[in-house]
Regions:
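A cross-kingdom C-terminal cell-surface attachment/processing module
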Residues: 256-271
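Solvent-exposed, non-transmembrane regions of membrane-associated and secreted proteins
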Residues: 3-155, 159-251, 268-276
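Short, charged juxtamembrane terminal tails flanking transmembrane helices
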Residues: 278-283
Length: 283
């Protein structure tokens, strides 16, 4: 009887530790979903002042005034935290295939990376456009969500959506690559291409001295056949995004719910054993 009680105690303790972590992630996920819904309802584009800030930033990028800095380097100065955008969320990154939805900030400061993904200093803002390349950095995982944990699972053709202002920009993954943390020429714009690059640490364990890149492109073709095919893809992509917009939680929430049911069941069985043990002692 005592061995059974000890066994149930071990199972409960072993279950409780990851369950608390998953519960924290689920709560964060629900909060982010409502924050996203609030953003969609209130977002009305950028003000004239913000448009001027955007133009000033893009001009600084084109002229090379802003240096590209590794957002995960321990020795870096936190210069990205100084942004004319302050703590304004400029948009949302959505990857339905990986169940990722993250707010986008300007400037990959520690504070911004704690809360979502951020535009790497020295790269374009994610508005799209030829000869532009926006790089969005995010942690491989964080205390409250998986963030870019599954980024290595992305495959060619997977869709990435950037909702910014009143605009939705759709990219399709072309390739992934792993570079050294100092190999920043890999993030330069590509002539006549509109590129979005997602960046995170690699491998999953220290010393994190490499970077995983996911490169996604927008396709531009003015031919009649291409325009027709592009419209079909656009409608399909829009349907995917609309479906994902309504999705509030990921599989982690369902796993957490199942875990709590299991926890209650084990606690009930343990309590029953303890009561039987007490009755046996009394007799």
């Amino acid at each position: 009887m005592k061995l059974k009680i000890v066994g149930y105690l071990l199972m409960i303790v072993g279950l409780l530790l990851p369950l608390l972590l998953f519960s924290n992630m689920t709560v964060h996920e629900v909060r982010e979903f409502f924050a996203y819904q609030g953003y969609k309802k209130t977002e009305s584009g950028f003000s004239k002042k913000e448009e001027e800030i955007i133009e000033h930033y893009q001009e600084a990028v084109r002229s090379g005034q802003l240096a590209t800095v590794d957002p995960f380097a321990e020795t870096r100065k936190d210069e990205q935290s100084v942004s004319d955008f302050g703590d304004r969320i400029i948009g949302y990154l959505s990857i339905p295939s990986l169940e990722i939805r993250q707010p986008i900030w300007v400037g990959a400061s520690d504070s911004h990376l704690d809360q979502g993904v951020a535009v790497v200093s020295g790269t374009d803002l994610p508005f799209g456009g030829r000869d532009r390349r926006s790089v969005l950095a995010g942690h491989r995982s964080w205390y409250s969500d998986l963030r870019f944990f599954r980024l290595n699972e992305m495959r060619e053709g997977d869709e990435i959506f950037v909702e910014i202002g009143e605009k939705v920009v759709t990219y399709r993954v072309k390739n992934t690559e792993i570079i050294k943390a100092t190999d920043w020429q890999k993030l330069l714009p590509i002539e006549k291409q509109d590129v979005l690059t997602l960046l995170t640490c690699d491998p999953l364990v220290p010393p994190f001295d490499y970077r995983l890149l996911v490169n996604a492109y927008r396709h531009h073709d003015s031919s009649e056949q291409a325009v027709s095919a592009s419209e079909e893809k656009r409608q399909s992509s829009q349907a995917v995004l609309e479906s994902y917009r309504k999705k509030g939680v990921s599989f982690i929430a369902y796993l957490t719910l199942f875990g709590w049911f299991l926890f209650v069941y084990l606690a009930y069985k343990l309590g029953k054993l303890v009561r039987v043990c007490r009755v046996t002692k009394v007799r």
